[in-house]
Every structure is written in C-alpha cells, then in structure tokens.
Amino acid sequence: MSFKKILGVALVSALALTACKEEKKAESTAAPAAQAPAKIKVGVMSGPEHTVAERAAQIAKEKYGLEVEFVLFNDYALPNTAVSKGDLDANAFQHKPYLDKDSQSKGLNNLVIVGNTFVYPLAGYSKKVKNVSELAEGAVIAVPNDPSNLARALILLEKQGLIKLKDNTNLFSTSVDIIENPKNLKIKEVDTSIAAKALDDVDLAVVNNTYAGQVGLNTQDHGVFVESKDSPYVNIIVARQDNKDAANVQNFIKSYQTEEVYQEAQKHFKDGVVKGW
C-alpha cells in the first residue's frame, strides 16, 4: 500500500474516532436534562388528612426534589388494591389491623408497612348528650362496620362502662361478643364513611378522625369521649414488596415524619393526633 493511501486511511479513522467522542460527549452532557424529576403517587383520604399530607409533599419537593401526586379517596375500599396493582406507589390512611384484614379478605399478599404516621383517636360524638351518663335505656349507638374499626369502637365503649366484651384484647370483636349491656343499648353498625353523618338519626356515634374532620368535628371541641393516646392503632404508610426500598418511597416517609407535618396535623385535628414515629 502506498504512503498516500496509508495516510488517507489513518486520517479517516482519526476523524471517525473524533466524531464518535464528540457524539458521546454530547449524549453525556444532554443526559441529565432528559431525566424526569423523581415522582411518587400516594393514596390518601380526602379532608384534613389530605391537607396534612400536602405539607409532607412540600417538604419532599424542597428537600428531595420529589414530586408527590395525591389520589384522593372517600372511603377505605380501594386504596390497598390500587397499591397492590401498581396504580399507586403507596398509601397513607389506615392502621395495621385494617391492613391485615383487608389484605386477607382480598388476597393482597404484596403489601408491606414502610412507615408510621399518627394515631388518630376514635371518639364518641353526639347531638343529644354531653356525657355517657345521659344515654337513656335503649339508646342507639352507631359504630363503624369494617371489622377492625368495629372492634376498636366496641373496646372504646367498654372503657366508658357502657358494655362488656367477652375478650377486650380481641382486635376483631363483633357485636355478638358483647356479654353485658346494662342499658340495652342498640349497637347499629354503619358504613365507616357515613358514621359521622348519622348523628341526626342516632343518640351517639363512634367516628374516626378522618370522617369526623370531613364534617367539621374534632375530638377536643366535640368529643363526648375520646380514645386514649396509648392506642395501638397507629396509622401507617403502605407500599409493595417490590418498591418498599425505592428512593421515592423512602424520601416520602422522611418528609412525612417531620415536626412540620406534626404541627400541621395538630392545627387541623386540635391536639387529636399523636406521633407514631
């Protein structure tokens, strides 16, 4: 091969190598700009709990660059299924006894607890009495009908001296487990989401903070009696086995478990919340 041909081949190779390097450099420079910001989709209940969670979203954005999208629910039927199927990355609305029962009944075997939020105490509310001693013979008391919150409400009624249960440590007690009922109270099981709205039709209703807050009630100003702060029913953040350690999930937890979010919860629930972390 002549010297000119060798020189030509070398020149073409050098130009190709330079072009390749420039292309890779351009790709390397452009890559960060093409990356989408970190995101997470979380299911929460509408009302005050959503407002509290929005404060966590602000912190997540400021500290971790995490965009939080909330999907709002009005009842407890769908959020766990949505996480299990991958429609949501996580949810924050329930306590462990509810998760256990819901997962068992629906066959949701991929859900895991990744963090705690708050204890939201149950309380008894009434438009007719200000003290349980004023409840008349045969008074009607509305309680949530989902298994975990039904037992929780019955245990709370027992602590007020209104009934006695066969086993007050059973977190899934039902009305048939009432062994003493001195005032012959009528225990009316209603959908958890409408318990607060039943106050016009019953003498007293046991309601959780989620739904009490939706109708403007809080434990401090309106509760006839309130669940004690040592309640084991701490609310939780739930994700899946396959994403529980993901950065977006972990950063959302860290954003929620902050003093700022606690203060926001105190503001909306009037001291009716207890830190769960």
Swiss-Prot record:
Keywords: Cell outer membrane, Lipoprotein, Membrane, Palmitate, Signal
Lipidation (S-diacylglycerol cysteine): C20
Subcellular location: Cell outer membrane
Any coiled-coil regions, as ranges: none
One GO cellular component, as annotated: cell outer membrane
Pfam families (UniProt xref): Lipoprotein_9 (PF03180)
Main localization of the protein described in the UniProt heading: membrane
CDD domains: PBP2_lipoprotein_IlpA_like
Lipidated residues (N-palmitoyl cysteine): C20
Signal sequence range: 1-19
Membrane topology annotation: Lipid-anchor
Recorded family membership: Belongs to the NlpA lipoprotein family.
Protein name listed in UniProt: Outer membrane lipoprotein 1
Organism in which the protein naturally occurs: Mannheimia haemolytica
Taxonomic lineage: Bacteria, Pseudomonadati, Pseudomonadota, Gammaproteobacteria, Pasteurellales
Gene giving rise to this polypeptide: plpA
